[in-house]
């Protein structure tokens, strides 16, 4: 018999630990452990796999773990030239980006939420079958494994709400007549309402999970197919990929996964700069940035509405109705309809604002020289869309005017679902008020947290300290603006970087060699470790967005 057989005490102990770990631990710690584990595993596998050729020097361990963390947190901060990785390493980085993407991790959240509801439904069912043959009454207390903890996925942060449940009949329930007698004469608690509620939540959560999984799969398959067809049809774009020794299929799946996860890694050293004269490819890649991030709630609602119309399933309509009323199953990507409309409008306005400023300031710049007006317009739109939060670039950011760079910094700092809402929905107001009244202890800890701006200021100061010698010797490359861009880019999990150029050195160094890496790729060990902390902080920023409330500045 297996040591984990369902009838053994060891299985019960394992089940209890499983429930405590997944349903009792705070989501912050669960997600932090998840990203740390994936990053460490990715580093070990990157180190074990061979580089592209034997002529390519093996990177330092710190650069490999930096790359693994960057892929897992979908930050795309480059410390190793991408073309030095072998095909197997590129596929591994693709897997890391897939596992770290927001949509994929939300599917995992739905899976565990569904498991929680299923366990709750089983725990609240009458146990007639378990005691039917013995004539014995059900036990008066429940086992530790039946104590469930609700793992909610609601904004502004994931909160654990502890709701112990029991199937035992309390003395007060018997006194008030709330108990019932079954056919064997034993008194037990009426569980029909809670069981029905758990069953309904289980059904809708499972359905939503399958919808998001289908959305995830369809977008990736469609994007992969479109890029492969484009590379085959347009010889120039295919020649660029083939000339770099990259398989067209690897390039397609890598780019689609990276763009949809909003990571921003591209398997070429130059990124998308190599394809700025191919607007068709840019237009194929661009929608995946929106589908996987800022407009994901919009297209998710459209997908559910389309499926409801095609299938006629009432459960799909119930999902939309609940979210329209401010309720739902706690899946914070499924926003109410009014908020979704304002989100789409906000995204469009921000993109247009960036497009207008970029065209006004950079239309005749060296980075766009030699391109047609249409290619320039598509390139400007591509940069505007990628500033939130993918980070793929079609020109060197160090050559862009300071005004545009500052605007990009603001865009990188904004959370993906930043929305201008001139009229507050009454259901949202009611929910916020009730939440404030019911979670006083939680709000105290929230107020004690520092605001994101405070944390970023501390990180910038720390990096200025660790890189103080380079700031003094190489002030143009190591300007404070470049450091701010790198830190905010890591926090926003974007990947924009001004890079490093030997030509910008005040004191030319004959041993300096230009590499296709980000600016942080030239930092010291302490600076890289600090930036990795920023990447983790940015990936988990939803837990601290409302920090700093204890400060009163008047």
Swiss-Prot record:
Tissue specificity remark: Mainly expressed in parenchyma cells bordering xylem vessels of nodes, internodes, leaf sheath bases, roots and leaves. Expressed in phloem of leaf sheath bases.
Q: For this UniProt entry, which segments traverse the membrane?
A: 26-46, 90-110, 208-230, 280-300, 342-362, 403-423, 444-464, 518-538
Pfam families associated with the record: TrkH
Q: Could you tell me the membrane topology recorded for this protein? A: Multi-pass membrane protein
Keyword Transmembrane helix in the entry? The reply is yes
Induction conditions: By salt stress in roots.
Residues exposed to the Cytoplasmic side: 1-25, 111-207, 301-341, 424-443, 539-554
Q: Biological process (GO) annotations?
A: inorganic cation transmembrane transport; sodium ion transport
Catalytic reactions on record: Na(+)(in) = Na(+)(out)
Q: Which domain of life is it from?
A: Eukaryota
A cellular component term from Gene Ontology for this protein is: plasma membrane
> Keywords in UniProt for this one?
Ion transport, Membrane, Sodium, Sodium transport, Stress response, Transmembrane, Transmembrane helix, Transport
Main location class: membrane
Q: Name where it's found.
A: Membrane
Asked whether the keyword Metal-binding is assigned, the reply is no
| Gene Ontology MF terms | monoatomic cation transmembrane transporter activity
Q: Which PANTHER family does this UniProt record tie to the protein? A: HIGH-AFFINITY POTASSIUM TRANSPORT PROTEIN-RELATED (PTHR31064:SF30), POTASSIUM TRANSPORT PROTEIN DDB_G0292412-RELATED (PTHR31064)
Family label: Belongs to the TrkH potassium transport family. HKT (TC 2.A.38.3) subfamily.
Please quote what the entry notes about the protein's domains. HKT transporters are proposed to contain 4 pore-forming regions enclosed by transmembrane segments with each containing a potassium channel-like selectivity filter motif.
**What does the record give as the function of this protein?**
Sodium transporter that under salt stress mediates sodium exclusion in the phloem to prevent sodium transfer to young leaf blades and reproductive tissues. Contributes to salt-tolerance in cultivars indica Nona Bokra and Pokkali.
| This protein's name | Cation transporter HKT1;5
Which source organism?
Oryza sativa subsp. indica (Rice)
> Taxonomic classification, please?
Eukaryota, Viridiplantae, Streptophyta, Embryophyta, Tracheophyta
Gene encoding the protein: HKT1;5
């Amino acid at each position: 018999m297996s040591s984990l057989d369902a009838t053994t005490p060891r299985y019960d102990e394992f089940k209890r630990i499983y429930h405590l770990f997944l349903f009792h631990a705070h989501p912050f710690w669960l997600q932090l452990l998840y990203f740390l584990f994936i990053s460490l595993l990715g580093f070990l596998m990157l180190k074990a796999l061979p580089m592209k050729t034997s002529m390519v020097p093996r990177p330092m361990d710190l650069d490999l773990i930096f790359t693994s963390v960057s892929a897992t947190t979908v930050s795309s901060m480059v410390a190793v030239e991408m073309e030095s990785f072998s095909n197997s390493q590129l596929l591994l980085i693709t897997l890391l980006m897939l596992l770290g993407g927001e949509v994929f991790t939300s599917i995992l959240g739905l899976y565990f939420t569904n498991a929680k509801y299923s366990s709750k439904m089983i725990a609240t069912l009458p146990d007639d079958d378990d005691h039917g043959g013995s004539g014995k009454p059900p036990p008066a207390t429940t086992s530790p494994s039946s104590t469930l903890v609700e793992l909610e996925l609601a904004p502004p942060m994931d909160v654990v709400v502890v709701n112990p449940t029991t199937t035992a009949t309390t003395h007060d329930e018997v006194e008030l007549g709330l108990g019932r007698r079954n056919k064997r004469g034993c008194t037990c608690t009426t569980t029909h309402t809670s069981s029905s509620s758990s069953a309904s939540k289980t059904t809708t959560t499972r359905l939503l999970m399958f919808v998001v999984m289908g959305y995830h799969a369809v977008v990736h398959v469609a994007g992969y197919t479109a890029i492969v067809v484009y590379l085959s049809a347009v010889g120039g774009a295919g020649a660029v990929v083939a000339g770099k020794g990259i398989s067209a299929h690897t390039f397609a799946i890598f780019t689609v996964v990276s763009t949809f996860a909003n990571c921003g890694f591209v398997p070429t050293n130059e990124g998308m700069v190599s394809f700025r004269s191919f607007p068709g490819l840019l237009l194929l890649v661009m929608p995946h940035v929106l589908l996987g991030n800022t407009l994901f709630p919009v297209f998710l609602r459209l997908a559910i509405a389309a499926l409801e119309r095609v299938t006629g399933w009432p459960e799909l309509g119930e999902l939309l109705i609940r979210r329209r009323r401010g309720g739902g199953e706690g899946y914070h990507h499924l926003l109410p309809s009014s908020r979704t409309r304002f989100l789409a409008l906000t995204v469009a306005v921000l993109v247009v604002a960036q497009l207008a400023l970029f065209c006004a300031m950079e239309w005749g710049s060296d980075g766009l020289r030699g391109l047609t007006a249409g290619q320039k317009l598509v390139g400007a739109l591509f940069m505007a869309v990628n500033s939130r939060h993918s980070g793929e670039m079609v020109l060197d950011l160090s050559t862009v005017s300071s005004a545009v760079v500052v605007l990009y910094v603001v865009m990188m700092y904004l959370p993906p679902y930043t929305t201008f809402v001139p009229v507050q929905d009454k259901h949202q107001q009611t929910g916020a008020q009730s939440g404030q009244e019911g979670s006083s202890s939680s709000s105290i800890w929230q107020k004690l947290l520092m605001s994101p701006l405070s944390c970023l200021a501390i990180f910038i100061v720390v990096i200025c300290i660790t890189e103080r010698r380079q700031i003094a010797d190489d002030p143009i490359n190591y300007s404070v603006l470049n450091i701010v861009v790198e830190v905010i880019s890591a926090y926003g999990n974007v990947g924009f970087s001004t890079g490093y150029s030997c030509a910008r050195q005040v004191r030319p160094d004959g041993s300096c060699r230009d590499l296709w890496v980000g600016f942080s790729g030239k930092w010291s060990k302490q600076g890289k470790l600090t930036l990795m902390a920023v990447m983790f902080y940015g990936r988990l920023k939803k837990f601290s967005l409302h920090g700093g409330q204890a400060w009163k500045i008047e």
